[in-house]
């Protein structure tokens, strides 16, 4: 069961959510946008609760199984947008963009996990294909869950590794994209 607890940390999945939200936010977004961004990015790891109910790591609903799939990500994205961002005044294309945003955030979890160096792989194509995948390059060290284990030397090494391979790229990409958007807006003829 211990290997089932090896994932990029919940903190790093949250950093990706905040970085993505910073780029995609249209002006000042409501608190629910930021909370849902983080929830969508970490939700797939709720599958670890299955261990308490006898669901094994490699099972369909086991850790890194269906709940880490792209199909599940789309379901979550559409449900999040439908439950929290649908109103009579919302334009359909804007609603679909919000659904896509939350779907991509949820999918980012399984994709990041596929870059880790441990476990059984990620069932990215579930429920259509039960194969569990890793990417050929796995620079992200697996992370312990639980405060005690996370505060160990191993946990500190994982944080340093995630700073390099997740936080730095996510924050850098957000800053570069946001700066590019601001510069493009400043240079557009309608602003002069």
Ranges and model annotations:
Residues 1-192:
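N-terminal membrane-targeting hydrophobic helices
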């Amino acid at each position: 069961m211990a290997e089932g607890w090896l994932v990029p940390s919940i903190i790093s999945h949250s950093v990706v959510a905040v970085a993505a939200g910073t780029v995609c936010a249209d002006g000042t977004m409501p608190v629910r946008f930021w909370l849902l961004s983080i929830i969508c990015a970490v939700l797939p790891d709720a599958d670890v609760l299955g261990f308490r109910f006898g669901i094994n790591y490699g099972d369909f609903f086991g850790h890194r199984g269906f709940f880490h799939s792209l199909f599940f990500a789309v379901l979550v994205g559409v449900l999040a947008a439908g439950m929290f961002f649908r109103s009579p005044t919302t334009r359909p294309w804007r609603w679909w963009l919000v659904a896509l945003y939350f779907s991509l955030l949820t999918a980012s979890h399984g994709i990041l996990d596929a870059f880790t160096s441990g476990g059984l792989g990620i069932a990215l194509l579930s429920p259509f294909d039960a194969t569990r995948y890793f990417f050929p390059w796995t620079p992200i060290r697996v992370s312990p869950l639980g405060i005690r284990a996370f505060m160990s030397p191993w946990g500190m090494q994982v944080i340093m590794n995630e700073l390099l391979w997740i936080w730095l790229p996510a924050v850098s990409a957000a800053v570069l994209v946001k700066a590019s958007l601001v510069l493009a807006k400043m240079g557009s003829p309608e602003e002069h």
